[in-house]
A protein has these predicted regions:
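Short phosphate-binding loop-to-helix
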Residues: 68-91
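Internal, conserved structured core segments that host functional sites
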Residues: 82-84, 90-108
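N-terminal beta-strand-loop-alpha-helix module at the start
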Residues: 1-61
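Class I SAM-dependent methyltransferase SAM-binding "motif I" and its flanking Rossmann-like core
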Residues: 117-145, 151
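Short, well-ordered secondary-structure micro-motifs
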Residues: 43, 61-62, 107-109, 137-140
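Long, charged alpha-helical interface segments
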Residues: 137-203
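Short Gly/Thr/Asp-enriched flexible loops that form oxyanion-binding sites at enzyme active sites
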Residues: 106-116
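Structural motif
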Residues: 10-12, 101, 202
Length: 203
């Protein structure tokens, strides 16, 4: 886990795996996306900020923690993106996200695909699920791993995709499924590319 400036708790399934829970508990600054604050507060924690339009925040929390709520009624984007924009405006670029998957598959796909937008906005972001971590990437990148660890690569705009340290060769994938279920052969691997792609590392 890399050092972060802040964490976003989205309004999907509350994390249950040890790694995302540890990332959440050790975060120096926590932004909850609207209703994501309900479970966080119920567990005895207090967020630094609650972002959104308040449509999924319990009335009791809305009243008691009104001073923490940063209202953003913009309906053209979602609360996760509003939280990223809020943090970037504060100069917080190294961002972890938890709770972005589960509950609704359409929200899950949307939250995952938006990671590429955050990369373009200048954020260094990782989204932790109960099964692995999504890392949006551009150009050539190297990752730490353990031998045999599963990894998937989803191509967005990358050309010239090549790998070092993975079991199976990669290429300029045209469908997301084509880059799934690869695995590490060493304690690190490198993706060589020009353009954008998304890496998923299974725990």
């Amino acid at each position: 886990m890399k050092e972060i400036d802040a964490l976003i708790l989205a309004n999907g399934d509350y994390p249950s795996a040890s790694l995302p829970l540890r990332v959440l508990e050790e975060a120096p600054y926590v932004v909850c996306c609207d209703g994501g604050a309900n479970e966080y507060i119920a567990r005895g924690y207090l967020p630094d900020v609650i972002i959104g339009d308040g449509d999924s925040l319990r009335e009791a929390n809305r009243l008691q923690y009104a001073s923490l709520i940063h209202h953003n009624p913009d309906q053209e984007t979602n609360d996760q993106t509003k939280a990223v924009q809020f943090l970037l405006a504060q100069g917080k670029r190294k961002i972890a996200i938890v709770g972005a998957t589960g509950k609704r598959e359409d929200h899950t796909i949307g939250n995952i695909s938006l990671l590429m937008d955050y990369l373009r906005m200048g954020a260094e972001v990782r989204s932790y699920t109960d099964y692995g971590v999504f890392i949006p990437c551009k150009d050539t990148c190297t990752f730490e791993c353990r031998e045999g660890q599963q990894v998937s690569i989803f191509n967005f705009t990358a050309k010239g995709l090549k790998e070092k340290g993975l079991a199976y060769p990669i290429y300029d994938f045209t469908s997301w499924w084509q880059g799934t279920l690869n695995k590490c052969t060493d304690t690190s691997f490198t993706i060589e590319a020009e353009g954008e792609y998304l890496v998923f590392l299974n725990y």
